């Protein structure tokens, strides 16, 4: 479990520098679509490296930067392709990385997809914290939205607006008896603590009829109620039920946070979305980056002037 220090906020003035992990760490999970074991390893990286993926099962494979422009497939997940090499289902892991404020990291994976773990970002958060976070000798860079950008497809839309911090608002619209109409909108005022407590453990979800159809096409072979909320025509099938009343929409925010981190920096802006998904999230990021008048890259000399609250490196520990 995660344990917070008594100080809920950054209490002392400290430099707002880039972060990586202290030491390499590895885990094995299950591929959502293959159903096969997948080895995952995180390694520290130098300043200004960014987040980079590498296929450990392919000798001499080309490293894949975590870039919105390398997303070539958004069917049910965000998938990166570079130099003919693919790494899929990256959004939950990227959400954890964004939530902890990690700037530089090498992710080595032994298959074409990141393991699904429990269907949320929480296992990745725990793993990164076990490795330990450390600050580096360079200021952390942020992308500040200076002009509202909106993308729309049919009735679905997503936008980023200028805002002093980072806020995410999301609304879904499911006409299903198991998805309460009163819990289809959620908001997150981003901070590391809010991310861990309110968002990181929200699981992905799927409808039983869709899962059965995918399995007929050799997809979702690793999917189960251990790593997803499964819904039939009327009910949630997981015996333990939901972790939050609004877990469905919280997970959509979790996905969006990971998709948005493909912009390359932590965001200063307000994200609003209605029925958005991986494709629209990616389109939004590309649209923002297409015009330098939409944004500016900024740094902060200290955490007091930085409008985003990251917990200090000693503010979270892993127990058990």
UniProtKB/Swiss-Prot annotation:
It catalyses: a UDP-3-O-[(3R)-3-hydroxyacyl]-N-acetyl-alpha-D-glucosamine + H2O = a UDP-3-O-[(3R)-3-hydroxyacyl]-alpha-D-glucosamine + acetate. Coiled coil: none annotated. Keywords: Hydrolase, Lipid A biosynthesis, Lipid biosynthesis, Lipid metabolism, Metal-binding, Zinc. The keyword Coiled coil does not apply. Disulfide bonds: none annotated. Zn(2+) binds at residues 92, 251, 255. GO terms for cellular component: membrane. One of its GO terms (biological process) is lipid A biosynthetic process. Its cofactor is Zn(2+). It holds the Pfam family LpxC. It comes from the Bacteria. Catalyzes the hydrolysis of UDP-3-O-myristoyl-N-acetylglucosamine to form UDP-3-O-myristoylglucosamine and acetate, the committed step in lipid A biosynthesis. Belongs to the LpxC family. This is UDP-3-O-acyl-N-acetylglucosamine deacetylase. It comes from Psychrobacter arcticus (strain DSM 17307 / VKM B-2377 / 273-4). The lineage of its organism: Bacteria, Pseudomonadati, Pseudomonadota, Gammaproteobacteria, Moraxellales.
């Amino acid at each position: 479990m995660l344990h917070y220090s008594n100080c809920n906020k950054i209490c002392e003035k400290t430099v707002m520098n880039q972060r990586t992990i202290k030491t390499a760490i590895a885990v094995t999970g299950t591929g959502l679509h293959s159903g096969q074991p997948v080895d995952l390893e995180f390694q520290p990286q130098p300043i200004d490296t960014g987040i980079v993926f590498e296929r450990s099962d392919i000798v001499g494979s080309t490293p894949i930067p975590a870039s919105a422009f390398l997303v070539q497939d958004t069917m049910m997940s965000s998938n990166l392709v570079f130099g003919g090499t693919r790494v899929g289902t990256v959004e939950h892991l990227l959400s954890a990385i964004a939530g902890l404020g990690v700037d530089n990291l090498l992710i080595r994976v032994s298959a074409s997809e990141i393991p699904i773990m429990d269907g949320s970002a929480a296992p990745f958060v725990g793993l990164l914290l076990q490795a330990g976070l450390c600050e580096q000798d360079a200021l952390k860079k942020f992308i500040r939205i200076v002009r509202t950008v909106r993308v729309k497809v049919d009735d679905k839309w997503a936008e980023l607006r200028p805002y002093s911090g980072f806020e995410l608002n999301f609304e879904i619209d499911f006409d299903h008896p198991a998805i309460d109409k009163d819990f289809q909108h959620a908001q997150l005022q981003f901070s590391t603590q809010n991310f861990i407590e309110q968002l990181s453990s929200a699981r992905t979800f799927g409808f039983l009829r869709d899962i059965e159809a995918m399995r007929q096409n050799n997809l979702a072979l690793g999917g189960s109620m251990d790593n997803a909320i499964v819904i039939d025509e009327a009910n949630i099938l997981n015996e333990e039920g939901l972790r939050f009343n609004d877990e469905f929409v919280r997970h959509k925010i979790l996905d969006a946070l990971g998709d948005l981190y493909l912009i390359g920096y932590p965001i200063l802006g307000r994200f609003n979305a209605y029925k958005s998904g991986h494709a629209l999230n990616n389109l939004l990021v590309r649209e923002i980056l297409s015009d330098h008048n939409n944004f500016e890259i900024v740094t902060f000399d200290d955490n007091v002037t930085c409008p985003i609250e990251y917990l200090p490196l000693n503010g979270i520990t892993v127990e058990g």
